[in-house]
Amino acid sequence: PIRAWAGGSSNETTRDMLQRELLGQPDDKTVRGTGAIPMKNIGEATRKPGVPNAHNSIVIRHKSGGNSRLGFKAYEMGKEKWMGESLDVIWLDEEPPPEIYTQAVTRTADKGGMVYMTFTPENGMTETVAQFMNDLRNGQFMMTAGWDDAPHMTEDVKEQILAALPPHERKMRSLGIPSLGSGLVFPVPEEIITCDPFEIPAHWPRISGMDYGWDHPTTAAWIAW
């Protein structure tokens, strides 16, 4: 038997996504056990105060005859609510704040446990995304999944959805590739406005500019044409 947590952005999203995927539709007891965990393995559950149909924790019957315990958490609870426990598995759905991710890693450290994260990189190249994409460390694994990995999506459906999305979001939505920054300056794919490095001809006019930050970082730019 193991001890595990599953967590999302809020108590409501944790209920509507993680609890539903694992146990079945939260507000319909007749479909309980239609998620990833079959009914015969679902034991006693405790309710989460103030959140209708949400579980705080639940007993899962293990094949050995013992009981595993699964707790449901939310990032909005703050890192203090993620402290103190020793766990075997933590599932984080949607990108967690850095302080929640480090708590999850710490909670599983003494048991050699695992931390799973499942999310679309909605926030761009964040600290967490950049580390996994550019500096994968011992014991870490990253897998991207795009629309081509979803056989239920037909080509017509893909085309319709792409047409409805802003151009700068299309790769992020369809391929799981993060946009650079939380919001792009130019709402177009990066390859349209970038080129390979080349030596700038001496006769090209040039401009340099600087913006001294007050409540934001100082920036500088060089322009040639």
Q: Where in this protein do the model-derived segments appear?
A:
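Nucleic-acid-processing active sites and adjacent nucleic-acid-binding tracks
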Residues: 202, 223-225
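Inter-Walker segment of RecA-like/P-loop motor cores
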Residues: 13-88, 178
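Short beta-strand scaffold segments in enzyme catalytic cores
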Residues: 217-223
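Nucleotide donor/acceptor-binding cores
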Residues: 1-2, 113, 205-206
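ASCE P-loop NTPase helicase motor core
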Residues: 89, 97-169
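ATPase catalytic-site recognition across NTP-hydrolyzing enzymes
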Residues: 150-212
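Conserved RecA-like ASCE P-loop NTPase motor core of nucleic-acid helicases/translocases
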Residues: 2-14
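Short, glycine/acidic-enriched loop or turn micro-motifs at the edges of active sites
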Residues: 96-97, 214
